[in-house]
Amino acid sequence: MLEGSHSRSDVPRSDIRIAEIDGLRGLAVLLVLLWHFIGALLPQTTVLLKLVSGTVIFGRTGVDLFFVLSGFLIIGILVDRRDADNYFHVFFARRALRILPPYAMLLIVFWILTALLPAGYYFGHQIPWWSYATFTQNWYIIKLNNWGPGGASVTWSVAIEEQFYIIFPVIVYLIPRRHLFPLLICIGTGSILARAACFLLYPQNAFAPYVATFLRLDGLCAGGMLALACRDAHLWRTMIAHRSTLMKVNGTFAAFIPFFLVALHWSPGTTMYYWGHTYLTVLYSLTLATILTNSNSRLSAALRLGFLRALGAISYTAYLVHPLFIGLAFTVVGKREELKSMSDAFLLVLAMLVTLLYSKASYILIESKLLAIGHRLEYSARGSGSRAADLSGPSAVSKGSQLQR
């Protein structure tokens, strides 16, 4: 596997591991952890605490970053490998080896704790087991109009990605490559409009526009469009030629973050569902485009830091299990989950340490070994033909699929 050694004049391929993308994963999960461990639990009793909470709430947007990254990585892999005889077999096998083991471990621990501990916000049976097992819990959340048990609440986004993994391999396989970019534009735009319409027509269900799959496809599609742009020789050369402009535009969008936070404070639903998620999709897509084309920028250097890359390696499991460990810490001592005292802070630090240690152990003992098995499942090349001709392009020769979350 090549790692961080390519020039940014080269087209990114799915067999090259880009260090900055690992750093972006780490940043995404760090944002979520900061929100759930600090911002969401602070009392709104003073101006300072309101200011801290109102700033750290930006951590919620880590999920939007994950969606853009997933769209970029998965669509890139699918496009690079759509000519393989074992296209579906290898893709789904690798996805299963990556996604299912940490997810299954979470559900097992969650169901055991639900049976042992008193029912409360974090543990309960509000969402049936089969919904988690079939990755349909996001639709059950819409039905309930609440998160369900907090210990497994973040799995709604995993459900969306799993549904994406099922549908888009078929789309990429069947649709000619030249039609994929406009198709992603249409799907992404439709998702943006449908999300706004849903909130306008059904404001009483604030969860639907947040967790419904077809209302959250814009980030995944934007990442996919960037993957296609990187695999088009003309578009890639254009991006390289205008890399400084990309960086400036990205900086301009980032400078808009304080206004976004103020709007989010005063009107969360209106902000997020009418324009907030769209803004974040553009911001994070520009950020990804910037690091792909500017390896010498300060942003790229920051994302190559060992801390962020190490966090990126365990980001999936840490994202999955951290609410469960927060809930476990407070439930065992019979306290409400909040950050009002030193004892609360101690419980949260303990939950954070357990989250990181569990995630690291899971990665070393289980996930890394299963990923190695997945990488031994190679895509087989098909002989020349119409589909092979359709793949002709800058990255049709890529050999592996190392860039999988």
Where are these regions (language model features)?
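Central hydrophobic cores of alpha-helical transmembrane segments
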Residues: 183-191, 306
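Alpha-helical transmembrane segments in multi-pass integral membrane proteins
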Residues: 1-20, 27-30, 34-60, 74-89, ...
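Alpha-helical transmembrane segments of multi-pass membrane proteins
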Residues: 23, 93-106, 172, 309
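Short alpha-helical catalytic segment bearing the HExxH-like zincin motif
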Residues: 22, 91, 155-159, 165, ...
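Hydrophobic alpha-helical transmembrane segments that constitute the membrane-spanning cores
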Residues: 105-113
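Function-critical hydrophobic alpha-helical transmembrane segments in multi-pass membrane proteins
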Residues: 148-173
